[in-house]
Regions:
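Non-catalytic C-terminal accessory domains or segments of carbohydrate-active enzymes
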Residues: 49, 309-872, 876-915
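Active-site neighborhood of glycoside hydrolase catalytic domains
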Residues: 180-233
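Catalytic-core region of carbohydrate-active enzymes that cleave or remodel glycosidic bonds
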Residues: 223-231, 235-287
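Aromatic- and acidic-residue-enriched segments that line the glycan-binding/catalytic groove
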Residues: 118-123, 148-171, 283-290
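N-terminal carbohydrate-binding accessory modules
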Residues: 36-101
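N-terminal export signals
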Residues: 7-28
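The substrate-binding groove and active-site-proximal loops of carbohydrate-active enzymes
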Residues: 75-85, 110-126, 165-182, 208-214, ...
C-alpha cells in the first residue's frame, strides 16, 4: 500500500509499502527488517535527539522497531516555508511535542531554494539545517519530504518557476528533468545525511519519496541511497482532493478519522497539517489561494490551538504511554446491539489487552450495549463521532483495567505513584472498572467522584467536566503501589502534560502549555505558557521537592494526590496594547500605462515556440510570462501598434491561477479590467478573454492623425495578475496568451516586464512586477517624504495601482508571546485588492469582498518587530476604477497572547539600498 498525504499506511497484517522501509519489497508477508527475532510489547524508545550514538531502525508487520523497541509514529505536517521566522519553528515544534506528537513531516519546497538553474540557497528562512537541528533539540523524529514534487498546495507543487520553460517532463524519467531533479536532491541530501537518526547526528528517521511512476521511483531510490541517505524510505503520491481541508478543526471529526486509522492497525500515522501557516508572497497554489493555509489545522496561523487539537493530544499521548497499541491484531467481532454503531475489535497478543473502536456515522447520538469482559456495558457515541474503549490494560503495580467507558489518555509511574488518565466528552459519566482480588482502599480526592466495590471489582464513576480535574486514589486491592486515577473532559485534558527525564516520568496539570521539564538536584524546572491565571500541580520522579516555572520559584505544598501543588495560581498574561496606524503616505504608480514610458530596457517578446502545454497562437509571438523569465507575481506588457487607425476593439486572452485578473490601457486611456474568477476548487488554471472597446475620443484621435499624414503608433499596456502555477499541469501558460483586434489588424511589437532580480534575503517568490516593487516602495528605508499625506478610509476611483506606507512600533514585554494580525475592514461591495508588505516581506493578498477573503492577515513575529523597534507597512492597492477603492479601516489586531513563548530573533529585512 502506498503512503498518502494524509495517512502513511498500515504496517499491519500482510500489507507493506510499495517501496518498503529500508528497501524495495514486494507485497506479502515480510519478516522483520533487521530484527533479530520477535519483538514483544514493551516501553517505546526514549525521545530522540542528536546523541552521537548510532541507532538501528527496522520494522515488522506491526510497527517500526527502533533499537529493538516498538515505536508508533504519531506525526503531523509542518511546512517551514510557510513560517518565515526561524525562531518560531521552535515554538511550533515544541507545541507539537507537548500535544503528543513524536514526529514531524517536513516537505521541502524546491522553488523556495532555487531561483535559477544551478543556484541553491539554504540560508535565512530557507535554512533546512537549522530546522532539522531544532527538531532534534525538541525531541521529534523527522520524516523528510524533498519531492522533487511535493504538492502541498504550493505553486507548481514546489517545482521551481524556471522549470516551466526547461526541457524535459517533470515527474518522469526524462533525462533533461532528471538532471535538474538529481542536482536538487544532491543539495538536499547533503543536509539530510548530516541529520540521520541512524548515525546519531540528528533525528531524520524516515525519508519519503514522491513519484507517480515506478521507474521514477526507482531512480529516486538509487539517487538518494547514492547520496548517503540510509534511513528507511517511504513512498507516497496520493493527494487529498484539492481544496479539501487537510486537517479538521472539529474534534468529533478528528476523533472519527484518527481512531478509524488506529482501528485498522495503522502504526505510522500522519495526522495531517498540524500548523498550516501563511502562503506568503506568491507561494500559494490555485487549490489554496488565500494567504491563510489550512485553517482547519490543529494550530492556527497565529499558532493557537484549535478545537480539533484535543483528540490529537489525547491520542498522541495514548500511543506514547500505553505500549499495547504498538502491537495489535484483529480480534473476533464484538457487535453492539445497535447497527448504527460500527465496532472494530483488536487485541495485543503479548499483554491480552483489548481495544474497541466504536464509530457512529449517523446524524444522531446513539446509545448501545457492548459486551466488555462478560458485561453488557451501555456506551453512547455522539453523532459523527467515535470512541475508543479498552479492557485488560496494565495500569501499573499489577493492577488491571477490567474495562472503561472512556478512553485512556496515558498511564505512567511517577515516583512511588502509578497514574492513569481517562478522558471523555463534557457532561458524560465516566465508568472505570478495576480488577481487585482483594478489597481496595479508594479515596475521593474531589467530591464529584463515586465508587463501589462488588465481586472483586472496583467501580469508579465521575461526571466529566463538573469540577475540572477529578482525582481518585486507590490503595491496596491486590497491589502494594498506590494508583491515582485522573478524569478529564477535552478542555481539562489540554491542561495535562506528561514529561520524561533521565530519572523518570512525571505529569503537570494547569498551564496552557508545557515546553520543557529539567531536573536540577531536588528541583524540577518547568518552562511553558500561561494564558489565564491557574493553579500548578506537578507529579515528579522520586526526590523532587521544589518547582520553578519559567525560572521563578513556585511555593508548593504536598497534596493528598502526592503532587506538588502551587499555593496560589500562576499569573496569566498581561495583554499588550497595540498602537493605531496613522501617518499614512500615498503615491500612484503604473507609469507603464503612459505611452511615453521608456520600455527600452524591457524584454522583447518575439519568441515563436514554447515548452508550455498551452498552444502558441498561429502568427503570433509567445506572450507567456514564464518564457521570458517572469515566474511570479504581476507582469506588464507593452505592445506598440502600427496601423491602428480604425481600431474598434481589443480582445486579450489570458491565463492565470485562481483569482487572476487583467487591466488594460490604450495610449494611456483606461480600457477596463477583467477578473478570471475563482471557479471550482479542483481547477488549476483559469482562462479568460477580456474584450474592450476603444473609447470614441481615442478612435477619433487615431483617425485624425492618420488622415493628417502623421500616423501615430499607440501603445497597448496590459497588467496581468497571473497568480499561481497549476500543481499538476505546471507548464500551463501564465499571462497573456493571444491578442485579437477588430476594425483593423495592426502590426504589434511586444515588450514584457515582470519581477526584478530575486530578493537575496526574502527569496524568489516575494515580489512580482509592479513598478513599486521593482523600485523598492515596499522596503524599509525607502524615502517616501515626497508622497502625499493621507488618512483612512479612502474612496479613490482610478484604474491601476496606488501605494500607501506608514511605520509603527510595538512594545510587547519580553516574557509575552503576542500574535498580531493586520485587519482590513471595508464595504465588501468595493472592488479592489491589497498586497500587504511588512518590513519588505509580502504577507499576502487581501481581495476585498472576494470569496473566502480573510480580513485579518497574520504578521509573524520575527518579521514583525515586537520589542520597541520600527516596522514598515506598505499596501499596494490594485483597483479597477469601477467602485470607490479603499483601504477602509486598517488596524492591528491582537490574535492571542501568552506569558512564555520562545526567544524570537528578528528576521533579516534589508531596506532600500541595504546590502
Amino acid at each position: 500500500m502506498e503512503l498518502s498525504r494524509r495517512v502513511f499506511s498500515a504496517l499491519a497484517g500482510t500489507t507493506v509499502l510499495g517501496l518498503a522501509l529500508g528497501g524495495s519489497v514486494s507485497g506479502g508477508a515480510v519478516p522483520a527488517s533487521g530484527a533479530s527475532g520477535p519483538v514483544p510489547t514493551g516501553p517505546p524508545p526514549a525521545p530522540p535527539g542528536a546523541d552521537g550514538v548510532r541507532h538501528r531502525v527496522a520494522f515488522d508487520r506491526h510497527s517500526l522497531l527502533v533499537d529493538g523497541r516498538r515505536l508508533v509514529l504519531w506525526a503531523g505536517e509542518l511546512h517551514p516555508f510557510r513560517l518565515p521566522s526561524p525562531s518560531l519553528w521552535r515554538d511550533v515544534l515544541q507545541k507539537m511535542r507537548a500535544y503528543g506528537f513524536n514526529a514531524v513531516v517536513v516537505p521541502v519546497a524546491w522553488n523556495q531554494h532555487s531561483p535559477a538553474p544551478g543556484r541553491y540557497d539554504f540560508s535565512g528562512v530557507r535554512d533546512l539545517d537549522l530546522f532539522l537541528r531544532t527538531a532534534a533539540e525538541t525531541g521529534l523524529y523527522v520524516v523528510l519530504r524533498p519531492g522533487p514534487y511535493i504538492g502541498a498546495d504550493v505553486d507548481a507543487g514546489g517545482l521551481p518557476g524556471w522549470l516551466t520553460t526547461a526541457e524535459g517532463d517533470a515527474r518522469s524519467t526524462d533525462p533533461a528533468f532528471l538532471r535538474h531533479a538529481d542536482e536538487w536532491l544532491t543539495h538536499v541530501d547533503a543536509i539530510a545525511a548530516r541529520h540521520q537518526y541512524t548515525r546519531g547526528t540528528g533525528t531524520v528517521l524516515l525519508y519519503r519519496l514522491d513519484a507517480p511512476r515506478r521507474d521514477l521511483l526507482s531512480h529516486l531510490h538509487e539517487k538518494v541511497r547514492a547520496d548517503g541517505v540510509d534511513v528507511p524510505l517511504l513512498h507516497g503520491d496520493t493527494p487529498v482532493a484539492w481544496g479539501e481541508a487537510h486537517g479538521t478543526a472539529d474534534a468529533a471529526e478528528a476523533r472519527r478519522v484518527h481512531l478509524t486509522h488506529l482501528a485498522h492497525g495503522v502504526t505510522l500515522h500522519d495526522a495531517g497539517t498540524v500548523f498550516g501557516g501563511t502562503s506568503w508572497g506568491w507561494l500559494a497554489a490555485p487549490s489554496a489561494p488565500t494567504p491563510t493555509y489550512d485553517p482547519a489545522a490543529a494550530l492556527d496561523e497565529a499558532r493557537r490551538p484549535t478545537d480539533g487539537i484535543a483528540p490529537l493530544h489525547q491520542t498522541g499521548h495514548l500511543l506514547r504511554h500505553v505500549p499495547d497499541f504498538a502491537r495489535l491484531d484483529p480480534a473476533p467481532a464484538v457487535p453492539a446491539d445497535d447497527a448504527r454503531i460500527q465496532v472494530r475489535h483488536l487485541t495485543n497478543p503479548d499483554t491480552g489487552a483489548h481495544v474497541y473502536v466504536l464509530r457512529n456515522d449517523s446524524a444522531a447520538d446513539v446509545t448501545a450495549r457492548l459486551p466488555l469482559d462478560g458485561t453488557d456495558v451501555p456506551v453512547t457515541v455522539p453523532a459523527g463521532d467515535a470512541r475508543l474503549l479498552t479492557a485488560g490494560l496494565d495500569l501499573g503495580g499489577g493492577r488491571k483495567l477490567a474495562y472503561a467507558t472512556v478512553q485512556p489518555m496515558l498511564t505512567l509511574s511517577a515516583g512511588r505513584l502509578d497514574i492513569a488518565v481517562f478522558v471523555g466528552r463534557t457532561g458524560e459519566m465516566a465508568h472505570v472498572v478495576l480488577d481487585c482480588p482483594d478489597e481496595p482502599w479508594p479515596t475521593r480526592l474531589d467530591e464529584e467522584a463515586a465508587w463501589a466495590y462488588d465481586e472483586d471489582r472496583l467501580h469508579v464513576t465521575v461526571p466529566l467536566g463538573a469540577g475540572g480535574l477529578t482525582r481518585v486514589r486507590v490503595r491496596s486491592g491486590g497491589s502494594d503501589r498506590t494508583l491515582l486515577l485522573l478524569f478529564a473532559d477535552d478542555a481539562v485534558s489540554l491542561r495535562l502534560w506528561p514529561y520524561e527525564t533521565p530519572s523518570g516520568k512525571g505529569l503537570v496539570y494547569g498551564p496552557a502549555l508545557l515546553r520543557g521539564a529539567v531536573l536540577d538536584g531536588d528541583t524540577v524546572r518547568l518552562t511553558g505558557d500561561m494564558v489565564d491565571a491557574y493553579g500548578l500541580e506537578v507529579w515528579t520522579p522520586r526526590g523532587i521537592t521544589g518547582v520553578t516555572w519559567n525560572g521563578r520559584a513556585v511555593a508548593t505544598s504536598v497534596s493528598r494526590a502526592r503532587s506538588l501543588r502551587s499555593r496560589r495560581p500562576l499569573p496569566g498574561v498581561t495583554q499588550p496594547s497595540l498602537p493605531s496606524l496613522d501617518g499614512w503616505r500615498r503615491r500612484d504608480e503604473n507609469p507603464e500605462a503612459d505611452p511615453g514610458h521608456d520600455d527600452s530596457g524591457w524584454t522583447v517578446a518575439d519568441r515563436r515556440t514554447s515548452h508550455s502545454t498551452t498552444p502558441v497562437p498561429a502568427e503570433q509571438p509567445v506572450l507567456f510570462a514564464d518564457d521570458y523569465g517572469f515566474h511570479y507575481g504581476d507582469v506588464w506588457y507593452r505592445g506598440r501598434l502600427t496601423g491602428a487607425a480604425g481600431l474598434e476593439s481589443v480582445s486579450l486572452a489570458y491565463s492565470t491561477g485562481a483569482r487572476g485578473m487583467l487591466m488594460a490601457w490604450l495610449d494611456g486611456e483606461p480600457l477596463g479590467t477583467h477578473d478570471a474568477g475563482q471557479g471550482d476548487d479542483g481547477k488549476g488554471t483559469w482562462t479568460g478573454t477580456a474584450g474592450f472597446r476603444v473609447p470614441q475620443r481615442l478612435r477619433e484621435r487615431l483617425r485624425d492623425q492618420a488622415s493628417e499624414g502623421r500616423p501615430h503608433s499607440p501603445v497597448l499596456s496590459v497588467l496581468v495578475r497571473r497568480t499561481q502555477h497549476d500543481q499538476d499541469d505546471y507548464r500551463r501558460a501564465r499571462g497573456l496568451t493571444s491578442v485579437a483586434f477588430r476594425g483593423v489588424s495592426p502590426e504589434v511589437h511586444w515588450r514584457v516586464r515582470g519581477a526584478a532580480a530575486p530578493d537575496p534575503v526574502r527569496g524568489p517568490l516575494n515580489t512580482g512586477g509592479l513598478y513599486g516593487e521593482r523600485n523598492g516602495w515596499h522596503l524599509p528605508g525607502y524615502d517616501d517624504g515626497g508622497w502625499e499625506s493621507v488618512s483612512f478610509p479612502r474612496a479613490d476611483r482610478r484604474q491601476g495601482v496606488t501605494w500607501y506606507r506608514t511605520t509603527f512600533r510595538l512594545d510587547v514585554p519580553p516574557d509575552v508571546d503576542a500574535s498580531v494580525g493586520l485587519t482590513l475592514d471595508d464595504d465588501p461591495d468595493r472592488d479592489y485588492r491589497v498586497q500587504v508588505f511588512l518590513n519588505g516581506w509580502n504577507m499576502g493578498e487581501h481581495v476585498n469582498g472576494g470569496p473566502g477573503a480573510r480580513r485579518t492577515l497574520v504578521l509573524p513575529n520575527g518579521v514583525l518587530r515586537t520589542r520597541a523597534a520600527a516596522n514598515t507597512l506598505a499596501l499596494a492597492v490594485l483597483s479597477g476604477g469601477g467602485t470607490p477603492a479603499g483601504p477602509g479601516a486598517v488596524r492591528l489586531t491582537l490574535l492571542g497572547s501568552a506569558a512564555g513563548g520562545v526567544p524570537v530573533t528578528p528576521v533579516a529585512s534589508p531596506g532600500r539600498g541595504t546590502p
